[in-house]
Amino acid sequence: MLSVIGEEYGVAKVVSHQTVSDWVKTAGLAMYKEARRVIRDSKMRYSFVVDESITIGSQKLLLVLAIPAECPGHALRHEDVKVVGIFVEKSWKAEDVARKLQEIVDEIGYKPEYVLSDNGHNLVKATSNLELPHHKDIGHTFGLFLEEAYDDDKRFNEFKELMRKARLQYHLTDKAFLLPPNQRAMARFMNLFNWVDWAVRLLLSYEQLNEEQKLAFVFVPAYKDLIWELAEAMKCYTHVLEKVKNEGLSIRLCKELRDYIVRNHIYPGNLRLTGIMMKVWNYLKEEASLLKPGQTHNLSSDIIESIFGIFKQKKSPNHLYGVTPFVLFLTSSMRHPASLHPQF
């Protein structure tokens, strides 16, 4: 491919794939080494976002990002973060995570204002061991609330199974355009709203379907109470998540969102849905207890999920390779500010 491009544009000698790969890794390593110095020299108020990857080969990748302690006024973007930790082990115990975080803190010279992560026991315990304030990621936490409410619910699981069977039965037919989206096996409660949205739209348009289509999806109206219940949870979840992701959590916003939940999402006739809403209400209260007046903290770790997504897309499809030095492309792929000048 590179030879074809070179011939088309009159380039006498085109760099090889290996050369490009070496450049990317060299630039990534240089930026990785400088990230901690830049934070230290600029006296940046920073916080950590920490997460570990799924098993790659026989290894797990621990990724540590430094983000602005104060929400920048929008959902975190790649240019807002610095990769300050890339570590690989077979597994990550809390003590190991704490040791790596402490190494980063020692090099920077002062502590982060807080640590943001999912509810993984090892990550939470590592933060506690270092006596650092810990924020629970809003998306993962909401997913846990839904899992607690619905994971063992008979009708919920029946409806999921009927959707799965419909996909298998009609995916190569003229009804395929009406099928629900795929259900994810992992983090399924964090991603169930795609099919909830599908179910709501099918309910609203059910009477407009022809007889064959109605027969294929006759099970959907039978679960309309469950669907509308999940739709209400989705409405609250979406509103709270978008507010917190884009504005950050402040004491003012916490009060605004808790008032919103009480006014709009407390259902005396539905104890399960009310229970979910009260868990969200209490979650906001707990996270706001870590704030001082005037502070606005980031509560969404979607940015680290995005970076892991890039890594999974670019890494070798051969699972036996594990994590290779090409992981350094993560730092060079970020849109770094001009103040970060790599020294080769």
How would you label these PLM feature ranges?
Residues 145:
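Conserved His + Asp/Glu catalytic blocks
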Residues 1-11:
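DNA-recognition alpha helix
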Residues 153-170:
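A polyampholytic, Gly/Pro-enriched intrinsically disordered region
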